[in-house]
Amino acid sequence: MFAITTWKENWEPNVCFHGWSCFHGDKTAFFAVMGNLYQHTHTYANIQRDQCFCINFLPISYYDRLVETIHHNEEKEDEFAVGNFTLEEAKTIHAPVIQEAFMNIECSLKEMKDLSGAGITSMVIGQVQHISVEEEYARGDEKRYGKDGFMMLVPGQQNLVTGEAGQSAVATVNIEKYD
């Protein structure tokens, strides 16, 4: 889980707490692929308009502050102030960056694709332009995994016998074995 940051149309900073992504690349380029971004949101409109966004990874201790931005995300609201985040300018794109994040990934928009054609969600692909990582996170896996590292969304598990949906959860990653 991470925060997508963009500028709103009125130049207020936007924070979108998001939980679906993967990252791909080769020797020529690296990409952030975000699934299930709702098309009716200002985050979607901001990315479409400005052709860029930043992905900000924060530890689970910031969870409640990120959720607060969901409840106070009107166009006129400064979502950095709502979440009590420090705003910095991105180095290579026109987007705000959360200074408290241990990793920021600056992306230019490569493609938006409505896979179902229903006009509800889109897959958003960003080409990575720059990555900033705090040194203690860059030097090894000790800080990246565990309570100070990446958050993961654990979707509500469905009971395969009854069809009843379970509650979603937020987890941190614990390395169990090296191979």
Give the location of each predicted region:
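Basic, polyanion-binding surface patches
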Residues: 1-179
